[in-house]
Amino acid sequence: MAKNKGVRIVVTLECTECRSNTDKRSQGVSRYTTEKNRRNTTERLEIKKFCPHDNKMTVHKEIK
């Protein structure tokens, strides 16, 4: 029998400043993958992480 998937899901975090910023260090969009608990965190994640394209700490939001 197959097990159910559980409450932990894999989500993708994308930099919010990479889309609008034109004076970046390099081209592209910074993306990270992480896991979140579906029961404890029902809303979308917003985490400050390092963006190598902007060369600074920026807010990364969960995308679908």
Swiss-Prot record:
One of its GO terms (cellular component) is ribonucleoprotein complex. One of its GO terms (biological process) is translation. Pfam families: Ribosomal_L33. Signal peptide: none annotated. Keywords: Ribonucleoprotein, Ribosomal protein. InterPro entries: Ribosomal_bL33, Ribosomal_bL33_CS, Ribosomal_bL33_sf, Ribosomal_zn-bd. The keyword GTP-binding does not apply. Belongs to the bacterial ribosomal protein bL33 family. NCBIfam families: PRK00504.1, PRK00595.1, rpmG_bact. This is Large ribosomal subunit protein bL33. It comes from Synechococcus sp. (strain RCC307). The gene is rpmG.
